Regions:
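Short beta-strand/loop motif that positions the catalytic acidic residue
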Residues: 28, 34-36, 40
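Catalytic histidine neighborhood in serine/cysteine hydrolases
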Residues: 55-72
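Accessory cap/linker subdomain of secreted extracellular hydrolases
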Residues: 1-27
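Extracellular/periplasmic catalytic domains that process cell-envelope and extracellular macromolecules
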Residues: 25-28, 57-58, 95, 120-123
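Residue-level signal for short, function-critical loop segments
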Residues: 38-40, 68, 279
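Conserved alpha/beta-hydrolase "acid-adjacent" motif
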Residues: 41-47
């Protein structure tokens, strides 16, 4: 397994393709009741999202239940009972007319999910946000294209945790861009994505991005949803191919687009949404010696958020 996964390059290969359930779904006929946690950072939520999406595309009866916690956590017994009564025992009970997505809201009991027509929320629309300079302090995250030829640089150092980087107001080891304080709640539903143009001082560099809710809640009893919205990682060497990465030319800028992990979260009034860009993540990436410089071209970097109500909702909450 250690050899097959090719940890050194990080390239997608036959080892990973053989473990991708999407490649094994063609014979599937059974109705699918999928359960997952949006903050499962072991088996990440993209797996349930991709599988349930493909099942729907195949015409398979599909229902999904998401809670806001980590690994494990089944749907309510009543929900499972209705599903198995219909699709295991063959008793007509109308479950196919029920909502297709059930999501536990941030402070609710996992046994009382909220029903939605589908996941992602059909009312979610892409909102494109641009970056405004601020490093090493905090820059802006705004709908306005600032159209500035600005570049900002961070220094990789995995000895600083992502949490510590998000909490501090000044750091050379991350770039942080935030919205204005929300005047209304804002509902994110789906897969945020980022297009980033960046350069490395060395032939390889980790790329980590977090979407966070600020100010950071430092209470020991804070829930993960109080602080982390979602996260994403990439290898800039794979900017043009997932299967055939190539060494970076130091100082040369490369453009890359990738998704964050799927999420469904309501960000509360009074918070700010922050995009944090850093390099090595002490919890999830390989950990090279500190010192690599990662430079981001702000003009050519955007983040897209799937927001329920789209630009109108974002404008009402932020502008």
């Amino acid at each position: 397994m250690a050899n097959g996964m090719d940890r050194a390059s990080g390239d997608y290969n036959d080892f990973w393709a053989g473990r991708d359930y999407l490649n094994q779904m063609k014979p599937m006929k059974a109705a699918l009741l999928m359960s997952h946690g949006f903050n499962d950072w072991n088996v990440m939520p993209e797996h349930s999202y991709r599988i349930s999406k493909r099942a729907r595309e195949m015409g398979i009866p599909t229902q999904i239940y998401y809670h806001q916690n980590g690994h494990g956590g089944p749907p309510p017994m009543k929900m499972m009972n209705r599903w198995f009564t219909r699709y295991l025992h063959g008793i007509e009970n109308g479950v196919e007319k029920d909502a297709k997505a059930w999501i536990v809201r941030e402070n609710d009991n996992r046994l009382t999910p909220t029903a939605y027509q589908e996941y992602p929320n059909p009312a979610a629309e892409p909102v494109v946000l641009h970056l405004g300079a601020g490093a090493p302090k905090i820059g802006k995250l705004t709908r306005n294209n600032l159209n500035i030829k600005e570049k900002e640089t961070l220094t990789d150092n995995h000895t600083f945790s992502a949490e510590s980087l998000a909490k501090t107001k000044n750091s050379n080891h991350r770039l942080l861009y935030v919205t204005s304080t929300l005047k209304e709640d804002l509902h994110i539903s789906g897969l945020p994505s980022i297009t980033i143009k960046a350069a490395s001082s060395k032939p390889a560099v980790n790329l980590s991005v977090y979407l966070v809710s600020l100010p950071w809640n430092m209470n020991k009893r804070a829930k993960i949803t109080d602080n982390i919205i979602t996260r994403g990682w990439a290898d800039l060497q794979n900017h043009s191919s997932l299967t055939n990465g190539s060494a970076l030319k130091p100082g040369v800028f490369y453009k890359m687009s990738f998704d964050f992990q799927p999420d469904d979260q309501v960000i509360k009034k009074g918070q700010q949404i922050g995009l944090m860009i850093f390099s090595s993540d002490s919890e999830y990436t390989i950990l090279p010696e500190p010192g690599t410089k990662l430079t981001v071209d702000l003009k050519e970097t955007i983040i897209t958020l799937p927001i329920v109500g789209g630009n109108a909702a974002f404008k009402a909450a932020v502008d």
